[in-house]
């Protein structure tokens, strides 16, 4: 008997329910494990210019990681929503964030930079799969951003957000790497970057 594939909307709803049952402490432990794994990768060690994200309450927490990476001497960039697109803006500390925007997300203030400076992109997701496909929130912000750059990409989620299959569209492009607290999935062609 064949089971019907979930739609993007159904998968988003299922993950939302699971997120609601996941204690905050568990998310922070998983985030710590995820980012410690990334910090051991060659791509992170060699990258000076890293795009991360300032996490929302339902995303893998990044606030401490972003601060720690900045203190370690990395140049950190965060996205800022402008219309239907994301601008990339340098992060200079919590004082440079503004949450007075449409989504009430901590976004960096200042001038945007070109994506060509980025050497690594950390990507949030609602769900990821073993083929490194990503399900976002449905607005296409990261789809558009990632289509404009060839920088290495790492998708990060809690373990329960790694699913059997993410529904994809013809324009969707898989990420280079997926990291959860106990799983690393890498594009074989780019494997050397993520060791």
Please report, for each region that a protein language model flagged, where it lies by residue.
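N-terminal active-site beta-alpha-beta segment that forms phosphate/nucleotide-binding
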Residues: 2-116
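Conserved phosphate- and dinucleotide-binding cores of soluble alpha/beta proteins
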Residues: 84-195
């Amino acid at each position: 008997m064949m089971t019907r594939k979930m739609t993007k909307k159904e998968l988003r709803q299922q993950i939302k329910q699971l997120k609601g049952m996941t204690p905050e402490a568990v998310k922070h432990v998983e985030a710590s494990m995820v980012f410690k794994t990334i910090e051991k990768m060659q791509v992170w060690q060699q990258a000076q210019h890293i795009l991360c994200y300032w996490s929302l309450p339902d995303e893998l927490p990044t606030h401490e990681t972003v601060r720690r990476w900045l203190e370690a001497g990395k140049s950190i960039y965060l996205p800022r929503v402008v219309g239907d697109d994301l601008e990339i803006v340098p992060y200079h500390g919590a004082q440079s964030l503004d949450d007075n925007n449409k989504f009430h997300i901590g976004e960096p203030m200042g001038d945007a930079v070109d994506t060509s400076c980025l050497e690594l992109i950390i990507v949030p997701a609602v769900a990821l799969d073993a083929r490194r496909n990503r399900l976002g929130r449905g607005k296409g912000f990261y789809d558009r951003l990632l289509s404009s750059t060839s920088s290495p990409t790492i998708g990060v989620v809690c373990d329960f957000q790694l699913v059997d299959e993410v529904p994809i569209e013809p324009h969707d492009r898989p990420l280079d790497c997926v990291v959860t607290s106990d799983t690393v999935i890498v594009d074989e062609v780019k494997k050397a970057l993520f060791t």
